[in-house]
Amino acid sequence: MNKKMFPKIYYYDQDFIDIYNKSLSWIQDKVILQKVADRGKKDKNYYSENCDYIDQMQACMSSFFLVYSNGEYSSTSAIDKFYQLQEESGAIRARYDNNNAIIDLDENEENIGFPIFAWAEYNLYHKTGNKKRISEVLPILDKYYKWIESKFLKENGLYSIDVNKIFYKNSPRVDAYYPIDFNSLQVHNAYCISKLADILNDKNLSLEYKKRFFSLKVKINSLMWSEKDGFYYDLDVNENILEIKTIVGFFPMLSEIPSEDRIERMIFYLKSTNHFGTPNPFPTLSVSEPGFSEDGNGYYGSVYTYMNFFVIKGLEYCGRANIAREFTIRHLYYILDTLMPFNKIKGHIWEAYRPMQEGPAYFDSNKKTYTEKGLICYLALFSISLMIENIIGLTISLPDKTVYWNIPTLEIMGIESLSLKKNQTTIICNKGKRGWEIKMESEKLYYFTINILNKKEKTLPIPSGRCSMLLDKL
């Protein structure tokens, strides 16, 4: 495989470069070509972990790393397949087979998935700058949101859905009637739709979703937050707080729901070894809970990589990039230790891992059954997306023509052949004879903001061609 389809990364730990490169090869096996009617057009490809069906969660999540493939792999084709199957009511189901038939999921009557399409689109816009796409998908997202609203919004202003039957099997959240995760993701859904409407200067739609965003945000903060514990909880059918600390209590960080004071109180739990700060972060259930299992046992303690992605991005969005980086590195090391153990016997990629030591988590400890094996999509969220954005520390906004680089430590790191639409860019930090310097190469002008060790931040226009800057001079 030609790895130049994706950017080349530089990092001082060769193991991280290796897992990045291996992920690129594994992705190739998951990309499916679909023939197009027009012979003059290139065959479109889409990402799918399974050849027999497409999955909404994986379609959306894969867009976060496929967007870095320099256009070789489509980051939108899998998502578009779901849009094409939207029903008149606005419904989009979680899974479809190859004949576009809905796949009925156990006890999921509406076959709903997590409402994350708008989040994927907002991220894609900043990576591709494709404004035309926003105008095409915004009506779809609007109808989808209102379908969810019509089905699951209750009179108290919160959403009710049985997450245990629909999303989480073998979970301690048995009495959750108003789940904090689904409500938080729906807030983020409204937030992203309002932002997309702003891009199109659709003031009416933007205002409509800002109202939805603030209304649900207020409900979550007033009903689902425990001031005593400093944590967000599920509610039971009578709107009573269920004092079971689970990883989804951190999902509100995705959309500016908690205040600064609340964020600090929540981060305490992420750092605490008595709660979620296990050697391999983050378990789905707090260590302090009676049902916590070191073997994982489904959502009683397993470390699910896709759930970690939500938490890491929440920390980043709340301005906690350095903490997000630390946790990303720790989890990625445990993935590496499971994939390449010291006994030299080849390991595997798993859906979930143990919190206290390397190795896959049990889905059911009593039956000794493991979580799903070989899910490359969730690995690539860490080994590609978070590798570029949180470990190396690059945040890209193509519409703004900006690259923000948070350099947390002076080590060799950077990226080569990063595609900013039609602008190939290289940014590498290295130590030369004159000291630490950043070497850059670009085909077009862009604006570069650098944050050095969280002490100094500076924005500079970077012209086309090659240039370098000494960090000491900054």
Swiss-Prot record:
Any one Gene Ontology biological process term? trehalose catabolic process
Q: Where in the cell is it found?
A: Membrane
Its placement in the membrane is given as: Single-pass membrane protein
Source organism, top-level taxon: Bacteria
Q: What is its main location?
A: membrane
Q: Does the keyword Magnesium apply?
A: no
Provide the Gene Ontology terms for cellular component: membrane
An annotated Gene Ontology molecular function = alpha,alpha-trehalase activity
TM ranges: 374-398
Keyword list (alphabetical) reads: Membrane, Transmembrane, Transmembrane helix
The protein's name is: Uncharacterized protein BB_0381
Tell me what organism the protein belongs to: Borreliella burgdorferi (strain ATCC 35210 / DSM 4680 / CIP 102532 / B31) (Borrelia burgdorferi)
